[in-house]
From Swiss-Prot:
This is Large ribosomal subunit protein bL21. This protein binds to 23S rRNA in the presence of protein L20. One of its GO terms (molecular function) is structural constituent of ribosome. Keywords: Ribonucleoprotein, Ribosomal protein, RNA-binding, rRNA-binding. One of its GO terms (cellular component) is ribosome. PANTHER family: 50S RIBOSOMAL PROTEIN L21, LARGE RIBOSOMAL SUBUNIT PROTEIN BL21M. Belongs to the bacterial ribosomal protein bL21 family. GO terms for biological process: translation. Part of the 50S ribosomal subunit. Contacts protein L20.
Length: 99
């Protein structure tokens, strides 16, 4: 059984016992989370979402991704700027798909 959920402005294909990395959501490790924006479950397609369909998971970890370096340089001048960014994420284990 598989489903497509929407979270953090992205659509993610999930299966039971999968680990997914999503944009940070509030909660601590070990806390259950329910995704109710389900677009598809097996052969059922929502318009845009399915009613009475949920995906349940448990938060495994809150963390930050690897640092990316953003470098800005203006041509014909000595202006340079170097920035780093680490995007926060949440790792979730999918426990159950209902629908």
């Amino acid at each position: 059984m598989f489903a497509i959920i929407e979270t953090g402005g992205k659509q993610i294909l999930v299966k039971k016992d999968d680990f997914i990395f999503i944009e940070k959501i509030e909660g601590e490790a070990g806390q259950n989370v329910v995704f109710d924006k389900v677009l598809l479950v097996d052969d059922k397609i929502g318009t845009p979402f399915l009613k009475n369909a949920t995906v349940t998971g448990i938060i495994e970890k809150q963390g930050k991704q690897k640092k990316i370096v953003v470098y800005r340089h203006n041509a014909k001048s000595t202006h340079k700027r170097k920035l780093g960014h680490r995007q926060p994420y949440t790792r979730v284990k999918i426990l159950e798909i209902k629908g």
